[in-house]
Amino acid sequence: MTPEGGHPPILTDNGFARLREEAAIEPDLPVESEVTKHTQIIAIYGKGGIGKSFTLSNLSYMMAQQGKRVLLIGCDPKSDTTSLLFGGKACPTIIETSTKKKLAGEELTIGDVCFKRDGVFAMELGGPEVGRGCGGRGIIHGFEQLEKLGFHDWDFDYVLLDFLGDVVCGGFGLPIARDMCQKVIVVGSNDLQSLYVANNVCSAVQYFNKLGGNVGVAGLVVNKDDGSGEAQAFAESVG
């Protein structure tokens, strides 16, 4: 399935150039067995409305244009991460589609929930309807479905996960808590609320590192920069 729509805009500022350089750094490979290919999984967090989906759409598009195999996964109940890539059209979510398939007595396949546009593979985990369930539990269920579909065997260079960062919930913190990603990128701005969320994410990474986790914070992407330098000062203070 390839929905119609225009190309997403491309950001060319120095901040994105630095971000691409960070993302290109290969993590330490496991030594248990010979590795022929290693997928780098990057989770992106930030407060609602800060521009995570916009940032990821452009980042994934540019990576694909450089010849990388990229999978973009929306991990927000709003299910709007991939809409920019598909011209404003919403992709069927994993949770919704798996429920329909189960009721029909059919098996869920990767072709039901994974779509491609401009070289980027994309999917949405989805979530429950408002007032009808737990968004964090929906994320956990979505990843359980990905496991059944062989998520870790897919041949991608990068997997980008778009997470909501406003809530303190185990489901939304899954990549950090379970070492599902190698790096975390925080999208923020110079306002106090976005930096508060950024600090919470950094604190979560630090907490799980003390418990033996290996996830690191790659950096802070400053969106809607008003020139005050608050986000830059925060990034320097947390290292």
Feature names for model-found ranges:
Residues T2-I50, F54-L71, E107:
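Extreme N-terminal, non-catalytic leader segments
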Residues A17, Q65, K148-Y158, F163-G239:
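Conserved catalytic-core segment of NTP-binding enzymes
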Residues P30-V31, T109-D112, G171-P175:
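Short beta-strand/turn micro-motifs at beta-sheet edges
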Residues H38-I42, Q65-R69, C75-F163, V167, ...:
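Nucleotide-state-sensitive switch-loop elements of NTP-binding domains
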Residues K47, L125-P128, S189:
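Short strand-loop junctions, especially beta-strand C-caps/beta-turns
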Residues F54, D76, D80, C134-R137, ...:
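Charged, alpha-helix-enriched surfaces in structured cytosolic catalytic cores
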Residues S57-S60, I140-F143, E147, N199-C202:
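Predominant activation on well-ordered alpha-helical scaffold segments within soluble catalytic domains
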